Amino acid sequence: MNDTLKYYEKDPIYKKYIHNQITFSMAYFYSENFILPFSHDEVVHMKGSILNKMFGDYDTKFALVRNLYAYQFAHPGKKLNFMGNEIGSFDEWKEFEPISFSVLDYPKHQGLQRLIRDLNLIYENHSSMYVEEYNPKHFSWILADNGDQSVYAFKRESEEECVIFVFNMTSNFYWDYDLGVPYPGSYEEILNTDKAVYGGWNQYNGLPCLTYGNGIHNQKYKITFKLPSYGAVYLVYNKKQLIDSKKPSLGKNENNTATIL
C-alpha cells in the first residue's frame, strides 16, 4: 500500500501524472494472496500518522482519509489497520504512550470512526466484497484510465450482487457524473464518504440510480449520480432484478382469464 499512500499525499493537480499508482496493484494482485496493510510501520519513525500523510488542509485531510479507507475496503484482499488509524490520530505511534483517544471529542474524528464501523458492516453484509476475491473473474475496471479527472471505478461481483466502487481523487464536484454499468435496472448507494455523519458536506445520492440511454466505458448501460469532492461512493446492484425481468408477466384475454405474455 506504499504506492497508494504516496498517491494520497500528492497535490491533486499532479495526480494525473501518477494515475497508475492506484491501478498498478491489480496488475499483479492475483499472483499471490495479498493482505492490504496500513500497519504500524507506516506510522512510526517520523513518517507521520495516516491522517497527517494526506494532502491539504484540515477538511481535505479528513475527506481524503475517508476516501482512502473506502478504497482499502473496496480493493480485493484482506484488510489490516493498525490501532489508532480508525480514529484519525494526528500523532504517529509512540510505543511508550497511549493512543490519543481524546481526539474523539471532535466531530471529524467521530465521523471517521463511524465510517470505519460502517465499512466493516458493509464488508460483512455484501458478499461481492469477499467471496472469490482472489479470482480475477470477480473484479474488473470500469474506469482505469481517466487520469484527466483522477476518477477511478471498478466492479466486484458475487452470484447475488454487483457492487460498483467510484473514487474521486480531486476537489472537483460532479453533480451529474455519467458512469457505465454492466446491468439494467436500479443501483442503490450504500456508502458515500461525504455524508455529514462521517464529517462530510452531505452531498450524497438519496434515491436509487436508474440505468438509461446508451452504455459508456465499455459497459452496456449507464447511470448518472452525484460524485462529491474527494468522495468515494459504493453502488450496489441486486441481481434479483435480472431474474425478475426475465419472468413472464400475466395479462388477460378476451375471456378474462390469465395468460402469459
Language model region names:
Residues 15-17, 41, 46-47, 58-62, ...:
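Carbohydrate-interacting/catalytic domains
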Residues 1-28, 35-37, 49-60:
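Extracellular glycoside hydrolase catalytic/binding regions
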Residues 33-43:
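Extended, charge-rich helix/loop segments that form flexible
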